[in-house]
Curated annotation (Swiss-Prot):
The organism of origin for this protein: Pseudomonas aeruginosa (strain ATCC 15692 / DSM 22644 / CIP 104116 / JCM 14847 / LMG 12228 / 1C / PRS 101 / PAO1)
Motif DXSXXG motif positions after renumbering to this chain: 35-40
Entries under Gene3D superfamilies matching the protein: predicted glycosyltransferase like domains (2.40.10.220)
Domain free text: Consists of a six-stranded anti-parallel beta-barrel core structure with an unstructured N-terminus in apo-form and a C-terminal alpha helix. In the holo-form the C-terminal helix is displaced by the ligand, thereby opening one side of the beta-barrel as a binding site, and the N-terminus containing the RXXXR motif wraps around the ligand and in turn ties the C-terminal helix in a loose conformation. The structural rearrangement upon ligand binding creates a significant change in surface charge distribution.
Domain PilZ: 7-103
Site (Important for c-di-GMP binding) residue list: 40
Segments carrying motif RXXXR motif: 9-13
Keywords for this protein: c-di-GMP, Nucleotide-binding
Annotated protein name in UniProt: Cyclic diguanosine monophosphate-binding protein PA4608
């Protein structure tokens, strides 16, 4: 990716390996999670991908036997075998799990608080 793209990025991506799936209506795809942020996810495009980019999706990230992150997402872009999704909504339990995951990986609570403030302001616009 270009330096300009990296400069525009406001949310740190966390490389993370978790069983993950994307759902849309009755359709379901198991996906390889490349990274996650407070803003969305990046996954490998499944071979049988036929999602409708005009309709919402749901992401499910299984972090363990009893930890699930669920997000309502929209497809932001698709290229080079990757799908970039933007988070549109996340429930309280899921954002708590995601916040903890990001906090552990960033190692900087102040940076996490700035990203959370950016997330809130982005959704208020």
């Amino acid at each position: 990716m270009s330096d300009q793209h990296d400069e525009r990025r406001r949310f740190h991506r966390i490389a993370f390996d978790a069983d993950s799936e994307i759902l849309q209506g009755e359709r379901r795809w198991e996906v390889l999670l490349h990274d996650v942020s407070l803003h969305g996810i990046l996954v490998g495009q499944p071979q049988d991908w036929n999602g409708d980019p005009q309709r919402p999706f749901e992401a499910r990230l299984y972090l363990g036997l009893d930890v699930l992150i669920r997000m309502e997402i929209s497809l932001a872009w698709a290229r080079d075998g990757l799908l970039g999704f933007e988070c549109q909504h996340i429930d309280l339990d899921s954002i708590s799990h995601l916040r903890r995951l990001v906090e552990l990986n960033l190692g900087d609570e102040e940076l996490l608080e700035r990203e959370l403030a950016l997330l809130v302001s982005a959704h208020d616009d």
